[in-house]
Amino acid sequence: MPRRSTIALATAGALASTGTAYLGARNLLVGQATHARTVIPKSFDAPPRADGVYTRGGGPVQRWRREVPFDVHLMIFGDSTATGYGCASAEEVPGVLIARGLAEQTGKRIRLSTKAIVGATSKGVCGQVDAMFVVGPPPDAAVIMIGANDITALNGIGPSAQRLADCVRRLRTRGAVVVVGTCPDLGVITAIPQPLRALAHTRGVRLARAQTAAVKAAGGVPVPLGHLLAPKFRAMPELMFSADRYHPSAPAYALAADLLFLALRDALTEKLDIPIHETPSRPGTATLEPGHTRHSMMSRLRRPRPARAVPTGG
């Protein structure tokens, strides 16, 4: 999600450029942007991170060094949602949940590397991928979560999707399995007033559709997070949003991570011919207490032990 709502200022400018008939709408949207900035805080705090090697059994993460072996290298690219901004613990971060899930169900040693940066747009993701290729070899698997900041920056829908496709294609050309969580639905953020929220929703849906087509064409696997999770955000906002009412909460991240994990697991196991060992509860899977249904409020989240880095010596 973007660090601050700039949707109205950009959108108002776009509307104003189409003619004086939109002057009233422009003034309204600018006013709403001013209000949104007073209730949506900037993202100053660094999200928790626990990069390293994960193994079956839910034990503490092992800090990776050159002498530490691993079977599958997983990289996370994208914006604040990819970093897990708003999470209180590393065990709530999407990358950690996905890495633990892969370790549990494949029995492989999963190395997690997070390249995502808070506030990134599709342009930023291209930079993340560029930097990765400079530093070292590409991963075996990549997860990208991107789109919201392209909406707030009023980046073009087509160019944003094409930049994402270029990143996916580069990773796929080097043998990586790529799963993309497409643009979230900004229309669920009640801190953004109407009609600004409706405009954000419309552009977000358009971008998600364009991303889906572009990612498929580039050989990646798109996961429509906005479409799949928006109903839950609308039904349970007090549970799905973090304290800033803007970024996802730990249960929301868990749902997103589960969707991405399933897509990545299927694609990765097909590529590497890895047998799957189903577990009763995947790391990060939201579980319901008796009396709750799948569509009612989730009461708790089953989590493994905290991801504490273990020195490997040397």
Curated annotation (Swiss-Prot):
Give, from the UniProt record, the effect of changing residue 244 to A: Strong decrease in activity
SUPFAM superfamilies per the UniProt record, alphabetical:
SGNH hydrolase
Regulation of its activity? Esterase activity is significantly inhibited by the serine modifier phenylmethylsulfonyl fluoride (PMSF). Completely inhibited by diethyl pyrocarbonate.
Q: Name one GO cellular component term.
A: plasma membrane
Q: What keywords sit in the KW lines?
A: Hydrolase, Serine esterase, Signal
Keyword field contains Acetylation: no
Effect of altering residue 80 to A? Answer: Strong decrease in activity
Q: What class of enzyme is it?
A: hydrolase
MF terms from GO for this chain are: acetylesterase activity; lysophospholipase activity
The family database entries (InterPro entries) matched by this protein are listed as: Ester_Hydrolysis_Enzymes, SGNH_hydro, SGNH_hydro_sf
Q: What would be one Pfam family of this protein?
A: Lipase_GDSL_2
Q: How does activity depend on pH?
A: Optimum pH is 9.0 (with pNP-acetate as substrate).
Q: What induces it?
A: Induced under acidic conditions.
Q: Where is this site: Transition state stabilizer?
A: 119, 149
Q: Where are the catalytic residues?
A: 80, 244, 247
Temperature note from the UniProt entry?
Answer: Optimum temperature is 45 degrees Celsius (with pNP-acetate as substrate).
- Can you state which reaction this protein catalyses? an acetyl ester + H2O = an aliphatic alcohol + acetate + H(+); a butanoate ester + H2O = an aliphatic alcohol + butanoate + H(+); triacetin + H2O = diacetylglycerol + acetate + H(+); 1,2,3-tributanoylglycerol + H2O = dibutanoylglycerol + butanoate + H(+)
Taking the record's annotation, the residue ranges forming a coiled coil are none
What does a knockout show?
Disruption of the gene leads to significantly reduced bacterial growth in macrophages and in mice.
Entry's family note: Belongs to the 'GDSL' lipolytic enzyme family.
Function, in words = Esterase that preferentially hydrolyzes short-chain fatty acids, particularly pNP-acetate (C2) and pNP-butyrate (C4). Also has weak activity with pNP-hexanoate (C6) and pNP-octanoate (C8). It can also hydrolyze short-chain tryglycerides such as triacetin and tributyrin. Important for intracellular survival.
Q: What is this protein called?
A: GDSL-like esterase Rv1075c
